[in-house]
Structure formats: structure tokens, C-alpha cells
């Protein structure tokens, strides 16, 4: 799995000569040339079906998308993410199995950070912005805690930026 954050540096190596007069193939450059906190990170998307499933009823689904169905309270999908800095936006694509409001809670590092709400069976993306969390390896968990038996939550993928 991707760590989700990296410091990227560029090093030029010249072998057997001076660098005046231009480069003649002794250097290599990558797409990102700055490092540290000024690096631009384009985000990370994790498919829910690739996460670890938990709870009594959570299962993989293939319709309306390849993802996970969270059928009852404490059904979840989770994985470990390394965070190099402590604030991100979390976007979850999902839907309800019907017209009832499905609710999926976001936990990071064991702390509830917010709830995604899906009011219909058409897949949609919703974002919880500026989520603060711990650094290093943290469990990211999507879990149902407010099931009343009238809806199921379907989750497709989670994007972190």
C-alpha cells in the first residue's frame, strides 16, 4: 500500500567532467523537484473492497459498483495509512441501498472525525474537510453506528488529499 506522503528530492550527478556548457546526459530529473512541506501531494485513493472488513455482516459487492456493503451497526472497512502531516480532506464515494439516509462514520486513529450522509441509491462523493489527526501509522476506518434497519450503506472508495 502507498504511504500517502513522501518527501521527494532531485539529485544531479555528474561523472567525469564539469557541468559548464550544459548537461550531456549525466543527469536525471523527476516530476517533483521540491521537498519538505512545500511538496505538492496529489492525494491517494483507496478502494474499499481492498480494505479489511469488520463486523457481523460487512461484505464485498459488485453492484452498483465494486465496493463494500455495510449492513448493520459496527460493520466496517479499515486499513492503516501513514500520515506525514496532520490535516487532510477525506472524500468517500458511496450511496444508500434505497431512498433512506445512509450514514457512514469516519474514524482516524480511533477517533471519530465526522459522518458521511448518502440520501439515495445513486453513488455520490461527499467530503469531510480539514480533518486533523495523528501522524505516522493511523487506522482509517469507515463504520456504521446508527443503523435503524431501514437502509444499508454502500461504499466504493476513499480519497485523501
Question: Which residues fall in each region the model found?
Answer:
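Extracytoplasmic
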Residues: 1-161
Amino acid at each position: 500500500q502507498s504511504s500517502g506522503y513522501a518527501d521527494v528530492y532531485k539529485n544531479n550527478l555528474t561523472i567525469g567532467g564539469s557541468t559548464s556548457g550544459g548537461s550531456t546526459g549525466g543527469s536525471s530529473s523527476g516530476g517533483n523537484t521540491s521537498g519538505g512541506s512545500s511538496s505538492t501531494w496529489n492525494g491517494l485513493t483507496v478502494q474499499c473492497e481492498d480494505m479489511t472488513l469488520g463486523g457481523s455482516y460487512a461484505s464485498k459487492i459488485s453492484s452498483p459498483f465494486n465496493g463494500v456493503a455495510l449492513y448493520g451497526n459496527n460493520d466496517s472497512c479499515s486499513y492503516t495509512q501513514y500520515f506525514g502531516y496532520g490535516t487532510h480532506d477525506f472524500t468517500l464515494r458511496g450511496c444508500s441501498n434505497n431512498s433512506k439516509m445512509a450514514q457512514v462514520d469516519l474514524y482516524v486513529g480511533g477517533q471519530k472525525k465526522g459522518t458521511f450522509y448518502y440520501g439515495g441509491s445513486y453513488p455520490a462523493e461527499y467530503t469531510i474537510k480539514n480533518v486533523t489527526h495523528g501522524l505516522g501509522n493511523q487506522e482509517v476506518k469507515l463504520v456504521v453506528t446508527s443503523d435503524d434497519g431501514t437502509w444499508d450503506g454502500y461504499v466504493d472508495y476513499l480519497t485523501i488529499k
